Amino acid sequence: MTSLTQVKQYGLYVNGEWETTAEKMEVLNKYTQQPAAEISVATKDDVNKAVASAKDALKNTFSPYERYEVLMKAADLLLSRQEEFAEILATEVGKSIRESRGEVERAATTLQISAEEAKRIHGEGVPVESAPGSENRMAFTVKVPVGVVAAITPFNVPINLVCHKLGPALAAGNSVVLKPAEVTPICALKLAELMEEAGLPKGRLQVLTGDGAEIGEWLLENQDVNMFTFTGSPRVGELIRSKAGLRKVSLELGNNSATIVHKDADLEKAASLISQKSFNNAGQVCISVQRIYVHTNIYTAFVNKLKEKTEKLVVGNPMDEQTDIGPMIRLKEAERVEEWVKEAVEEGAKIELGGKRDGAFYLPTILTNVNDDMKVCRQEVFGPAVAIAQYDEIDEVISKVNDSDYGLQAGLFTNDLQFAMKAAREIEVGGLIVNDASAYRVDHMPYGGVKKSGNGKEGPKYAIEEMTEERIIVLNL
């Protein structure tokens, strides 16, 4: 085993060098709640130095093929160290070792996709001669890097979501200043070591650790940052957008994902997928199923089937192979979910399963008899709790799904093609998943939301569009 059993110290990664600072911060093992690592806390000078280094690196040629080679080598190195990274993930996040292995594999895939996309960045010919007075002119567009990209990543998927920002940014020819979540920074720091080994040119990647609010503010103040890409809460996303000015901003924010189970659905399939995709990573995923709308005709049968599937999930030590669900990221988050569930019960909800907390663990919880004004339906739970409500009519359930501040993804189980197409047209989300839960995602698909779920798209091909500028060249011959 190579998991974090001793407190290891990590510095900042700036201009290709590792630097320690006077102030340190502990990273906890989320299962034992004991220190697993110690990280350096960046100062404003460190932030400005990192941005200057990233800007300076842009002066050096980094061809599309070189980007491809570096990213492919990094993916190979990551796969060769899958178990090491998986154990770090299980330690610093608390997700199960099996789920952690899957995340590392997906992160490598994200780097591979980014590498391939680096070779496909191109412009197009523009027929300017069709305009009067433009005879003997030719025009074409090229895609150029936006420049210095500040990437701020969340705690819940700390290797794959880092790769979703780092991979496309580098593939597009940018430099990156990465700020990982302070509670789960180790995978990002280890990834910097790996990128260096893969041959990434000096200065193309900086990793800053420490207080997110402070570092984020300093990055926003620095006008040499050309773009911000952020995954996290709507509150912080709105703050970044308000302070970024005319600079590019891409935001992947919250959601209270809905999944519909229609009367013609395959109940076995629906219950199995929803159980899995409601409680993975203790429900701490932006597209985890939170609201479930079930047709009245099959409501009781579905609730029983979902309880049956969920009861089989094993809660425990993330390092145990049998474990499905580990602790939440912080004790206070488990306490918050506990409070929201208690509040729902006081307002009339019924606990069908779970509803209990043990330290930072919160048992997978199924609530019925809910209404759309309860916090567990209206806000983002970001924990292992789902709320099930009934519906009778298609228009009614579409209206319920849309009655939300969020719009990232939704799920729909049905064999009715007309319903599926109506939902595709009318449900206000960035992605509708038919015959799977809202939490379905593969890493090359476009991923992003509407309303308070953010703007812009992830998925390497689509993120590269966000991270480049289109420039037109006109030749007067």
From Swiss-Prot:
InterPro entries membership: Ald_DH/histidinol_DH (IPR016161), Ald_DH_C (IPR016163), Ald_DH_N (IPR016162), Aldehyde_DH_dom (IPR015590), ALDH-related_metabolic_enz (IPR051020)
Record's note on what induces expression: Induced by growth on sulfoquinovose.
Amino acids binding NAD(+): G232, S233, L253, E380
Active site: E252 (proton acceptor), C286 (nucleophile)
One MF term in the entry's GO annotations: lactaldehyde dehydrogenase (NAD+) activity
Catalysed reactions listed for this entry: (2S)-3-sulfolactaldehyde + NAD(+) + H2O = (2S)-3-sulfolactate + NADH + 2 H(+)
Keywords: Carbohydrate metabolism, NAD, Oxidoreductase
Gene3D superfamilies, per the entry: Aldehyde Dehydrogenase, Chain A, domain 1, Aldehyde Dehydrogenase, Chain A, domain 2
Keyword Oxidoreductase: yes
Domain of life: Bacteria
Annotated EC: 1.2.1.97
Purpose of the protein: Part of the sulfo-TAL (or sulfo-SFT) pathway, a D-sulfoquinovose degradation pathway that produces sulfolactate (SL). Catalyzes the oxidation of 3-sulfolactaldehyde (SLA) to sulfolactate (SL).
Similarity annotation: Belongs to the aldehyde dehydrogenase family.
PANTHER family noted in UniProt: ALDEHYDE DEHYDROGENASE
Record's protein name: 3-sulfolactaldehyde dehydrogenase
Record organism: Priestia aryabhattai
Top-level taxonomy: Bacteria, Bacillati, Bacillota, Bacilli, Bacillales
Gene: sftD
